[in-house]
């Protein structure tokens, strides 16, 4: 900057001297090197004592900021004739199946229908919808997934499963925050055991990466307690084939941490969270059946040999503090664990035996709308109201999905035949809310 410019600057008359750089902000718009005109304009935004000389600062940055503010001020309303808060109150009532269409209307609707505020308001007002997400494996080992809307009773489209899990085996699946579905670990046919973690956001309908696990593992146990993801045991290629190690992922901290090791190495076969503890049952290093329970409050494992694990079979789940399991191959009977007698008791019977074929086998039992949802390998589902087991209630035990209701009857029959031939089966089943 030349001397004449400094004399003409008001800062010079006040006895201030240009120094570089005294600006304590990351945003500076002065561009002192461009001449007197810029310095004078810079006084509008930067105090005279904090002018700096930074030739790489963009002089249009503040202008763009103002322009953005102006655009926000004059942007059209979400719904013509309505204030935005009232428009949001209307849009959050749109059924979840139509949210994909909302995102196509305009950029403002896209941002709204993809943001946390939109879905937090739906949850606050009791309008969130639970959908069932099902992962299947066909005879060729390919993984596919579908989601079922129990309200419209239709299967909805989903983005493809990421390539790293399209043929993986022994991977875990869990839900955090009600809307994030995680896939983690497993064994890739080419790469072997993995530490990889990815998650699907039901609000945006997209996949994302998450921090890798601390240990490679496959065929391990996993659960969610207090919105933290726990994994334990399993196998890993190498000298120590069966693992004792366990770890936890905290989404708030976005990192994994080791927890106490299991008492013995184990490949878990079934697991459930019950009474604030994580119960696992599986095979030890010498193919012996073993059971352990983890208490997160004291970070310790302990062997279990009571009546619960003695009569424990998969699939099972806990709902409202009670532990339920299936008592029939096709899921037509339910049983419940009675803590007072330390035994499993018969609970409900649909009186509608479907058969013993592989396609009719009940593969998953999950809570849905405060009821129990039974999912079979042929993608048929039954919803059971266990809150009031009144035999006269016609909706006590109802079928909500008959394998692909969006298809014709002929295609359903063909799919059933093809399903038996392909020996496709369900690998994981979860419920996500949005």
From Swiss-Prot:
GO biological process, one term: regulation of phenylpropanoid metabolic process
Gene3D superfamilies, alphabetized: Kelch-type beta propeller
F-box domain sequence ranges: 76-122
Superkingdom assignment: Eukaryota
InterPro entries attached to this UniProt entry: F-box-like_dom_sf (IPR036047), F-box_dom (IPR001810), Kelch-typ_b-propeller (IPR015915), Kelch_1 (IPR006652)
Pfam families: F-box, Kelch_1
Kelch repeats: 129-178, 180-227, 229-276, 278-321, 325-371
UniProt key word Chloroplast: no
Keywords: Kelch repeat, Repeat
Protein name: F-box/kelch-repeat protein At1g55270
Organism: Arabidopsis thaliana (Mouse-ear cress)
Upper classification of the organism: Eukaryota, Viridiplantae, Streptophyta, Embryophyta, Tracheophyta
